[in-house]
Design a protein with these regions (language model features):
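Canonical tetratricopeptide repeat
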Residues: 54, 95, 129, 162, ...
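Register position in tetratricopeptide repeats
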Residues: 61, 68, 102-103, 136-137, ...
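Flexible helix-coil transition and linker loops at the boundaries of alpha-helical arrays
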Residues: 39-48, 81-91, 185-197, 294-301
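Residue-level recognition of tetratricopeptide repeat
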Residues: 48, 57, 64, 89, 98, 123, 132, 156-157, ...
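TPR alpha-solenoid repeat register
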Residues: 51, 92, 126, 159-160, ...
Length: 435
């Protein structure tokens, strides 16, 4: 399972909206009560634009909390109704941009974010959503500019977290971690929603895990669960960590809990890999079948898992032709580094190593420190008999995070040893011939 920044892209992959409408509501009220509150207001006055905006905001929050995309559909209806009544409501336009983003409709998200900025150029969150959409299509310089503008307007949990993500993409992991720590502190001071703070704590844990720092990752995941009990992202993150610690029974239990809350294909695949690792193939197969079932069902509900399925198929050497088609389809609307990585991995698995090399070089272009990227690069160069580069990237994968996957980390180590032996053998033979 890949839980590093922006890899978990199934339903919602970025922080939510910085603020809601200026309507009085009791501090700490549950999201369900907020939804009921705004619905009650609309019963009294069906043309209350702010109430529709508030309802849309609450529905988005609910979607983030439980991962149910239907709440985004309901939020879209409420926000469009708000804009029909009050066309210049920048907040509603910004929230609508976020709904489009959640569905991976990145062009529509960017368009609506720009409209929101035209209505209110001082709204930092609109710049944040614009940056998110630009990031997903690989426009990194434009995304960075949007995030920097957001930061100029507001030093918040949301702006800090986004800048942290940009730093992580460019390999500045220390800067990313520092920004996330500051984001959490700022978020707590501003009494931001618990889910937003928990998301940031989970992301901080994921950044530590990506560097193989298990104690810090554990601390962050546990804190995320304390902030927002049963938070599915933190449960899955802790499950991955327990697997790295070889505490497999605990990892299985945690993944099962996360899947019960939100059945994401990444989680089911990761659980299946643990079963495979500990010699329980029948249960592994059940989870792998669940991955495909989730993918089919989600497609019917217009939730796209092309990337997740393409990684899953390639990782497990099944449906490789279909998998490559899914990966290449990603490039039709997403051109971030992981779109190129999933294409590279699938080209490699389909025996097209030369093409895979071109794609993996694009995936590595920002200098992102991701063991999974390095592993893919190492295996691709290995297949091309580029021994030096293969050794370099496999070694980087293991030095970056020796726990990056319960199965593939061992594969990387074995491939690296094989390469080192072959190089040593070639050296001995060369000396013999020279003598």
């Amino acid at each position: 399972m890949k839980i590093q920044r922006h890899i978990v892209a199934a339903i919602v992959t970025v922080l939510g909206l910085g603020f809601g409408p200026n309507l009085s509501f009791a501090e700490g009220a549950r999201t369900d009560n907020q939804i009921a509150y705004y619905q009650q207001l609309l019963t009294r006055n069906p043309r209350n634009s702010k109430a529709y905006y508030g309802l849309g905001d609450a529905l988005i929050r609910k979607a983030r909390e439980i991962g149910d995309p239907d709440y985004f559909n309901r939020a879209e209806e409420a926000l469009k109704r708000s804009l029909e009544i009050a066309p210049n409501n920048a907040g509603a336009m910004r929230h609508l941009a976020y709904v489009f983003y959640s569905r991976h409709e990145f062009e529509a998200a960017a368009t609506h974010a720009r409209k929101a900025i035209e209505m209110d150029a001082t709204d930092g969150d609109s710049y944040g959503i614009l940056g998110d959409a630009l990031l997903e299509v690989g426009k990194y310089d434009e995304a960075k500019a949007a995030y920097e503008k957001m930061m100029q307007l507001e030093d918040s949990l949301y702006s800090r977290s986004r800048l942290a993500g940009m730093k992580s993409f460019h390999g500045d992991t220390a800067g990313s971690i520092a920004d996330l720590e500051r984001a959490i502190a700022v978020g707590k001071e501003a009494k931001q929603p618990a889910e937003s703070i928990a998301w940031t704590e989970w992301q901080l844990g994921s950044d530590h895990f990506a560097l193989g720092n298990l104690p810090e990752a554990e601390r962050c995941y546990l804190q995320s669960l304390k902030t927002y009990p049963n938070y599915y992202r933190a449960l899955a993150g802790l499950a991955q960590l327990r697997a790295a610690q070889k505490r497999y029974d605990e990892a299985i239990d945690l993944y099962q809990k996360a899947i019960a809350i939100l059945p994401m294909p990444d989680y089911a695949a990761a659980l299946g890999d643990i079963y495979a690792k500990i010699g329980r193939p029948e249960q592994a197969l059940q989870q792998y079948e669940l991955v495909e079932y989730i993918g089919r069902l989600s497609s019917l509900n217009k939730v796209l898992y092309n990337r997740e399925l393409a990684y899953f198929y390639a990782d497990h050497d099944i449906k490789l032709k279909e998998s490559l088609e899914l990966a290449q389809r990603e490039l039709d609307y997403r051109r971030d580094i992981y779109a190129y990585d999933v294409v590279a991995w699938n080209l490699y698995k389909n025996g097209k190593a030369e093409e895979a090399r071109d794609a993996i070089e694009k995936a590595l272009s920002l200098g992102t420190r991701d063991a999974r990227l390095f592993y893919h690069a190492g295996m691709i160069y290995h297949s091309l008999h580029a021994k030096d580069k293969a050794k370099e990237y496999l070694a980087r994968a293991l030095s970056t995070n020796p726990f990056f996957h319960p199965i593939f980390a061992e594969t990387a180590a074995q491939a690296l040893k094989q390469l080192e032996r072959s190089v040593q053998q070639a050296g001995v033979e060369g000396q013999g011939q020279g003598g």
